[in-house]
């Protein structure tokens, strides 16, 4: 059976979301059309508004509706000498939820991936270089993901930071709290053994 062009367009549009295939997109579309048109209209309004009004902070590149995000304009954190480099705005939220970091961020919006056409320019590294050259930064914490691309990105930024007098560190990787060793992959176990701490 073929759907109407508008229904088909809605299904195709929903498939752009991560983890949403044809069947899931169809279920979502039918749920909104059959049972919750009010929520569907609210979703459309919110999505349209976010797409037109949400941009990137001109200092750290995270999501914001303003020129600068709340952290960068904060009197307590906006002038911190410590910058934590992350791959995505979601990483900022994860670190903020922990409440253990009180510095600034720099969001790469990805990682180095030459095969996908993602190089230093796409990651905004010229802006990061400007921050480092200002002399206001004393420490750079690299919190990229523990993947091949994340490691390559961290090494690239660490090399870039060598031109400046500042401490550069990488967040630790290892066994998660509450995790059982038998379920931890060998690479993570190796990192845990190599990065062990005295007690």
Curated annotation (Swiss-Prot):
GO biological process annotation, one example: DNA recombination
Renumbered zinc finger spans (C4-type): 57-72
GO MF terms, alphabetically ordered: DNA binding; zinc ion binding
InterPro entries with a match to the protein in the record: DNA_Rcmb_RecR, Rcmb_RecR, Rcmb_RecR_Znf, TOPRIM_dom, TOPRIM_RecR
Top-level taxon: Bacteria
Segments passing through the bilayer: none
SMART domains: TOPRIM (SM00493)
Stretches assigned to the Toprim domain: 81-176
UniProt keyword list: DNA damage, DNA recombination, DNA repair, Metal-binding, Zinc, Zinc-finger
Protein's UniProt keywords contain GTP-binding: no
Function: May play a role in DNA repair. It seems to be involved in an RecBC-independent recombinational process of DNA repair. It may act with RecF and RecO.
PANTHER family according to UniProt: RECOMBINATION PROTEIN RECR
Family: Belongs to the RecR family.
Protein name from the UniProt record: Recombination protein RecR
Organism (species): Shewanella piezotolerans (strain WP3 / JCM 13877)
């Amino acid at each position: 059976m073929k759907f109407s062009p508008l229904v088909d367009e809605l299904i195709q549009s929903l498939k752009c979301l991560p983890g949403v295939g044809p069947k899931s997109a169809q279920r979502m579309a039918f749920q909104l059309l059959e049972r919750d048109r009010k929520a569907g209209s609210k979703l459309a309004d919110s999505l349209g508004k976010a797409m037109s009004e949400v941009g990137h902070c001109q200092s750290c590149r995270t999501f914001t509706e303003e020129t600068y995000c709340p952290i960068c304009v904060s009197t307590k954190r906006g002038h911190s000498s410590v910058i934590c480099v992350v791959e995505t705005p979601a990483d900022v939220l994860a670190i903020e939820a922990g409440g253990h970091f009180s510095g600034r961020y720099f969001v790469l919006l990805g990682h180095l991936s030459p095969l996908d056409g993602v190089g230093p320019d796409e990651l905004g590294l010229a802006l990061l270089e400007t921050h480092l050259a200002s002399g206001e930064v004393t420490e750079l914490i690299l919190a990229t993901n523990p993947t091949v691309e994340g490691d390559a990105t961290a090494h690239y930024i660490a090399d870039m930071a060598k031109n400046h007098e500042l401490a550069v560190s990488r967040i630790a990787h290892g066994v998660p709290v509450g995790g059982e060793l038998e379920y931890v992959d060998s690479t993570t176990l190796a990192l845990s053994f190599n990065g062990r701490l005295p007690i």
